[in-house]
């Protein structure tokens, strides 16, 4: 199976508490204009590797502004793309899964407000999940 999605978000400021026009039309802080995700998953149905599966995907976002306004020191967080993968094994109602996120160990920023309050993204990581369906 393949799942993909794209979102275009024009989250612009249309009104301010002080009616300051300098912020009108600016993209809301920490809101990417573009976001894209794709995930593909395949589970082997026959043969020696019966019930094993794998997945591969990526998620990407465009640049984001750290604060509102046309300020000289406005922080711009660059866009990024992350590559993710997974391995699966199903046995009747039980599934064991390993997810490998940010497999290229990319350094990126998920958002923030200014140079002192910026939030780094997660480094390469592995998650294990066991699921039992009743």
Question: Which ranges hold each PLM region?
Answer:
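Gram-negative outer-membrane beta-barrel transporters
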Residues: 1-68, 129-133
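Asparagine-centered polar/low-complexity signal
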Residues: 5, 34-37, 73, 84, ...
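Flexible, surface-exposed loop regions and adjacent strand-edge segments
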Residues: 18-26, 70-75, 113-120
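Residues that define the transmembrane beta-barrel architecture of outer-membrane proteins
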Residues: 32-36, 79-83, 122-126
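C-terminal beta-signal and adjacent terminal beta-strands/loops
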Residues: 59-69, 88-134
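Outer-membrane beta-barrel transmembrane domain signature
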Residues: 61, 72-82
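Short amphipathic alpha-helix initiation/capping segments at coil-to-helix junctions
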Residues: 76-80, 87, 119
